[in-house]
C-alpha cells in the first residue's frame, strides 16, 4: 500500500463517512508536491495541450467558471491517464477596463483619482493590487481540483506576453493590417474609452420614437423624420432620401432648415434609405451613427460632434452645451414641442447598446482610433474551418461562425485607459515623424531628435488574449514547448465569446504562426437557474460554486456540472441536483467500504488473473457491463459528450455495481466456499479498480482517497492507465441471462410490494417458463434467485397455472406466482384497499366533473385540461389494480 498521509501504514480502512474537506485539501497539496500536473515532452508519446480561457485577474469563481474548468480538467485528466504528454496552461487576463475600474474605486475610498497619481504611479498601484488580490481566482481553481501545470502560469501583462504583443502589433502595422484613422466607434462615456463591436451588449429597451418636422428651407412645407435620440439632431448635417423617391426630388436645390438652429442642411439621395419605411426620409448625423457615417462619407457631408467624451453636450450643441445627453434629450423634446416641430411621440421597443463592463449606454461617435483590418485575416480563419483544420462542436455553431466572419468589420483595438499594453508607437516632438517599433527608439529616425512621445492609448484586452495559444508557449522565441504543443488540441469555452476571443485567436494564430491555434473548439452553453433564467444577484438565484463545494464537496459539484453539460443544450442548474450527486459520491464511498471488508487482505494480483470462462453468471455479467462502460465512457469523452460519460458511469456504478452486483455476490463473500469467495474477491477488486479509474477525471478526490486503501503499493490514480476494453470480458450471452435474472427478481419484489408482504417473510415462488433455454438458465440460477428474494421454496416449471390465492406477475412470456395464504391479514388488507378505493373514486369523480364543466372547458388552458385527462387515466388504472387485489384477497378466505 502506498503512502497515504491520512492513514497509518497498513491501515486498509475508510472512515464511516466521507469527510471531503480534509480529503480535498490533503490530496491537492500532495499532487502539487509530487508534481503530478507537470507537462513532459517525451517524443515517444502523443501530446495533448489546452490553454485555459484566462479569467479576469479581478475575477471570483462563478458557476460558469466552474463548468468551463471542470470540463477542461475532465479532459486533461482523461488524456493524462491515456498516456499523453498533457499540458494545461493556466493564467489570468489583465482585463484592462475592469481592473482599472476596480483600482479607481479603491482610490475613490481614499478621495483620490488616477489623475491625482499620474499614469506611472497609477500603473504601479494596479500592479500592487494584482500582487495582493490577483491570485484569488487561481486559488479557487485549485479548490475546484484543476490539474493545470501551475509552474507555467501566465499573465497577459507579463514580460513574455508583452513581447509577443509588441512583435505582432509591429508586424501587422508594417503589413498594412493595422492603421490609425478617424472613424465611427462605440464610445463608453463612463469608462471614457472606445469599445469594439463585440464589447457592446444590446439590451431590449422600452423607449420612445420621436417624429420631428424638418421644415423646407424655402418655407413651402416640411418632411417628418423619426429618431430615438433627438439630442443627436444638433449634429445633423443632412437629410437622406432614396434617389427614386419622387416625393422629394424637388428638394435637391432647396435644402432643409434644422429645427432649433439657424442651420440649413442639404438633402442627399442615397440607396441606403428605404422608401417604404416611415416617411422615407432619414436624418443624417455622421458623427453619431454608424450608418449615417457611411452616408456622410459617400456624400461628403460635414461631421459635427455634439458631445464630449463624458456624454456632455459640447459647444457645437449651442444653447444646450453643458447638459448631460439624456437631460439634453428632455430639453430638446420640450423645445421641439413648444416651437411646433414635434409631430408625435410613439412607444418604441428597440435594442440599446451598453458597455459590457459598466452597462452604460454606449454612444456611437467619431474618434481617432487604431484599427485592425480583419477581412483578410477572417478569410483565412473561415477557410481553416471549412477545410476541417479546426472543427467546431457542436456543429450547430458552424453557420453562426461563417455568417459573423463574412460580415466582420474592422476591429477597433485602441482604448483610452492607462492599464494595458501601451501601443508601441512614437511621434517626434520636433518633426512630427511617426514610428512604430517593438522597443522605444532612442532618437527620431528622420531628424535625430531624442524628444519622442509615445502613443497614450493601450490595446484592447482581447488583442493580447488573441495571441494566448502561442504566446503562452514562449513565442516569439523558438521554444521546445512551441514545437511540441502547438497547435493546441482543443479549446473549451462558452459560446458567448466565440467572436470576442475564439475567432480572433483563429485569425492571429493562422496569420502569425501559419497554423490554426487549436484542432477542436468545444462551445458550451451558459449556466442558468432551474427555470432557465439568467443567474443574477438582484434576482437572488445565483448558485455560488464556493458555497456548494463547502456544503456538498467538490466532486459532487464536478459530477453535477459534467452530467448537465449536454452539447448545444442550455444548462439548468438547481442546488438540489448537486445534493443528489453528493449522494452518488457517498454511494461510491460506501460501496468501497463494503468491498474493503472482503478484499483488504487479498493479494492485489487476484484482480489481474481472471478467467471469465470459469466464472459464475454474476461475475461474467459485471465484467461484460464494465467493458461496455469503458467503451462508452472513452467514446463519450473523445467526442466531448461529457454528459453521456457521466450518465454511463452513474448508471453503471449505482444501478449495476452497487444495487445488483454487490447484492448478488454477498452469499459468495460471506459463504464457506473458498473457490467462490476467491472468484468474488478477484472480480470485485478488478471492477472497483477500473471503476475508480473511470470516475477519476470527473471525481478526482474521492477516487484518489479510495485508491490508496486498496491492497498493494499504489502511486497516484491520476498516473494510472485509463481502462481499455478487454475482449475476453465481452459476453452478450451473460448479459442476456442476467437481464432475465433481474427481470424475475424484479417481478418477485413487485409482488412483495403490491401484496404488502413483510420484507422478512419467506415466500414460495412458482415460475412457469415455456422456453427451453430460459428454463434451463433460470433453473441454474434458482439458488441466487432464492437468496435475493428471500424465497423459501422455488419451483421452475415448463407448464403450470396460477395457484388459488396467488399473486402473479408477467415478465415477458414468463409467469411468476406467489401464494399469499398465511402471508397477509385478509381483513386488514381489504380494509386498506377499500379505503384507497373510496379515496380514488372520489378524486376520479372530481376530475371527471371538471371536464364535464362547460366553463372550465372554455377557459382552462389546454395543458391544464390535458393534465386532468392524464389524472383520470391514472386513477382508472389504479382502480383496476385495487379491484384485482380485492379479488385475490377474497380467494384467500
Stretches with model-predicted labels:
Residues 43-45, 53-54, 87-100, 153-161, ...:
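Short, solvent-exposed turn/loop segments enriched in Gly/Ser/Thr/Pro and often Arg
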Residues 77-85, 106-119, 139, 143-148, ...:
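Secondary-structure transition/capping motifs at alpha-helix termini
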Residues 2-8, 12, 17, 26, ...:
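Residue patterns forming the tRNA-binding/recognition surfaces of aminoacyl-tRNA synthetases
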Residues 65-67, 290-295, 504-512, 649:
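Alpha-helical support elements that line or immediately flank enzyme active sites
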Amino acid at each position: 500500500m502506498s503512502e497515504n498521509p491520512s492513514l497509518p501504514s497498513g491501515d486498509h480502512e475508510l472512515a464511516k463517512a466521507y469527510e471531503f474537506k480534509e480529503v480535498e485539501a490533503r490530496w491537492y497539496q500532495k499532487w502539487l508536491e509530487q508534481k503530478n500536473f507537470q507537462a513532459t515532452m517525451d517524443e515517444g508519446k502523443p501530446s495533448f495541450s489546452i490553454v485555459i480561457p484566462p479569467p479576469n485577474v479581478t475575477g471570483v469563481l462563478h458557476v460558469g467558471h466552474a463548468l468551463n474548468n471542470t470540463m477542461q480538467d475532465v479532459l486533461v485528466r482523461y488524456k493524462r491517464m491515456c498516456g499523453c504528454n498533457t499540458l494545461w496552461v493556466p493564467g489570468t487576463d489583465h482585463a484592462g477596463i475592469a481592473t482599472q475600474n476596480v483600482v479607481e474605486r479603491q482610490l475613490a475610498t481614499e478621495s483620490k483619482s488616477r489623475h491625482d497619481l499620474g499614469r506611472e504611479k497609477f500603473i504601479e498601484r494596479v500592479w500592487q493590487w494584482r500582487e495582493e488580490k490577483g491570485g484569488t481566482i487561481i486559488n479557487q481553481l485549485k479548490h475546484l481540483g484543476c490539474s493545470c501545470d501551475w509552474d507555467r502560469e501566465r499573465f497577459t501583462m507579463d514580460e513574455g506576453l508583452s513581447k509577443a504583443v509588441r512583435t505582432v502589433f509591429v508586424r501587422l502595422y508594417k503589413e498594412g493590417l493595422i492603421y490609425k484613422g478617424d472613424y465611427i466607434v462605440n464610445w463608453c462615456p463612463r469608462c471614457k474609452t472606445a469599445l469594439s463591436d463585440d464589447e457592446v451588449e444590446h439590451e431590449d429597451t422600452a423607449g420612445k420614437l420621436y417624429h420631428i418636422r424638418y421644415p423646407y428651407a424655402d418655407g413651402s412645407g416640411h418632411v417628418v423624420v423619426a429618431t430615438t435620440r433627438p439630442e443627436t439632431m444638433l449634429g445633423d448635417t443632412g437629410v437622406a432620401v432614396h434617389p427614386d423617391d419622387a416625393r422629394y426630388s424637388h428638394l435637391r436645390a432647396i435644402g432643409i432648415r434644422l429645427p432649433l438652429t439657424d442651420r440649413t442642411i442639404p438633402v442627399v439621395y442615397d440607396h441606403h434609405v428605404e422608401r417604404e419605411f416611415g416617411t422615407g426620409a432619414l436624418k443624417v448625423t455622421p458623427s453619431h451613427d454608424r450608418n449615417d457615417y457611411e452616408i456622410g462619407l459617400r456624400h461628403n457631408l460635414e461631421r459635427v460632434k455634439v458631445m464630449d467624451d463624458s456624454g456632455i453636450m459640447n459647444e457645437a450643441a449651442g444653447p444646450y452645451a453643458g447638459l448631460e445627453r439624456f437631460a439634453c434629450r428632455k430639453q430638446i423634446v420640450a423645445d421641439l414641442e413648444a416651437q411646433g416641430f414635434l409631430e408625435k411621440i410613439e412607444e418604441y421597443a428597440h435594442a440599446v447598446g451598453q458597455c459590457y463592463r459598466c452597462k452604460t449606454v454606449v454612444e456611437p461617435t467619431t474618434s481617432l482610433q487604431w484599427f485592425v483590418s480583419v477581412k483578410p485575416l477572417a478569410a483565412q480563419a473561415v477557410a481553416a474551418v471549412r477545410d476541417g483544420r479546426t472543427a467546431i462542436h457542436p456543429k450547430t455553431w458552424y453557420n453562426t461562425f461563417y455568417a459573423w466572419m463574412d460580415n466582420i468589420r474592422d476591429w477597433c483595438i485602441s482604448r483610452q485607459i492607462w492599464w494595458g499594453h501601451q501601443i508601441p508607437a512614437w511621434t517626434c516632438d520636433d518633426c512630427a515623424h511617426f514610428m512604430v517599433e517593438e522597443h522605444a527608439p532612442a532618437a527620431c529616425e528622420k531628424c535625430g531628435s531624442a524628444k519622442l512621445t509615445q502613443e497614450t492609448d493601450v490595446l484592447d484586452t482581447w488583442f493580447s488574449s488573441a495571441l494566448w495559444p502561442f504566446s503562452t508557449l514562449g513565442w516569439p522565441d523558438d521554444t521546445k514547448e512551441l514545437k511540441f504543443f502547438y497547435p493546441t488540441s482543443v479549446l473549451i469555452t462558452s459560446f458567448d465569446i466565440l467572436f470576442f476571443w475564439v475567432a480572433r485567436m483563429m485569425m492571429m494564430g493562422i496569420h502569425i504562426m501559419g497554423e490554426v491555434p487549436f484542432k477542436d473548439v468545444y462551445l458550451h452553453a451558459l449556466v442558468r437557474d432551474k427555470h432557465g433564467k439568467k443567474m443574477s444577484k438582484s434576482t437572488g438565484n445565483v448558485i455560488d460554486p464556493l458555497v456548494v463545494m463547502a456544503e456538498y464537496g467538490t466532486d459532487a459539484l464536478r459530477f453535477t456540472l459534467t452530467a448537465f453539460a449536454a452539447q448545444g443544450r442550455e444548462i439548468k442548474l438547481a442546488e438540489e441536483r448537486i445534493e443528489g450527486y453528493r449522494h452518488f459520491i457517498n454511494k461510491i464511498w460506501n460501496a468501497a467500504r463494503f468491498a474493503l471488508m472482503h478484499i483488504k487482505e487479498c493479494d492485489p494480483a487476484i484482480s489481474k488473473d481472471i478467467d471469465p470462462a470459469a466464472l459464475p453468471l454474476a461475475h461474467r455479467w459485471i465484467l461484460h457491463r464494465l467493458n461496455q462502460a469503458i467503451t462508452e465512457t472513452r467514446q463519450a469523452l473523445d467526442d466531448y459528450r461529457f454528459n453521456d460519460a457521466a450518465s454511463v458511469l452513474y448508471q453503471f456504478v449505482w444501478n449495476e455495481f452497487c444495487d445488483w452486483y454487490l447484492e448478488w455476490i454477498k452469499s459468495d463473500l460471506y459463504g464457506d466456499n473458498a473457490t467462490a469467495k476467491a472468484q468474488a474477491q478477484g472480480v470485485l477488486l478488478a471492477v472497483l479498480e477500473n471503476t475508480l479509474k473511470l470516475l477519476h477525471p470527473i471525481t478526482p478526490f474521492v477516487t484518489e482517497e479510495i485508491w490508496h486503501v486498496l491492497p498493494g503499493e499504489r502511486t497516484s490514480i491520476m498516473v494510472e492507465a485509463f481502462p481499455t476494453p478487454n475482449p475476453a470480458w465481452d459476453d452478450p450471452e451473460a448479459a442476456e441471462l442476467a437481464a432475465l435474472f433481474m427481470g424475475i427478481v424484479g417481478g418477485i419484489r413487485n409482488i412483495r410490494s403490491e401484496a404488502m408482504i413483510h420484507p422478512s417473510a419467506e415466500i414460495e415462488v412458482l415460475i412457469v417458463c415455456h422456453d427451453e433455454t430460459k428454463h434451463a438458465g433460470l433453473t441454474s440460477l434458482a439458488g441466487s434467485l432464492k437468496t435475493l428474494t428471500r424465497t423459501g421454496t422455488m419451483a421452475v416449471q415448463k407448464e403450470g397455472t396460477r395457484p388459488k390465492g396467488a399473486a402473479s406477475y408477467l415478465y415477458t412470456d414468463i409467469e411468476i406466482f406467489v401464494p399469499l395464504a398465511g402471508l397477509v391479514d385478509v381483513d386488514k388488507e381489504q380494509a386498506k384497499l377499500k379505503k384507497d378505493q373510496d379515496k380514488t373514486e372520489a378524486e376520479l369523480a372530481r376530475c371527471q366533473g371538471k371536464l364535464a364543466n362547460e366553463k372550465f372547458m372554455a377557459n382552462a388552458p389546454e395543458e391544464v385540461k390535458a393534465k386532468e385527462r392524464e389524472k383520470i387515466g391514472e386513477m382508472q388504472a389504479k382502480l383496476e389494480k385495487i379491484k384485482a387485489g380485492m379479488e385475490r384477497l377474497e380467494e384467500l378466505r
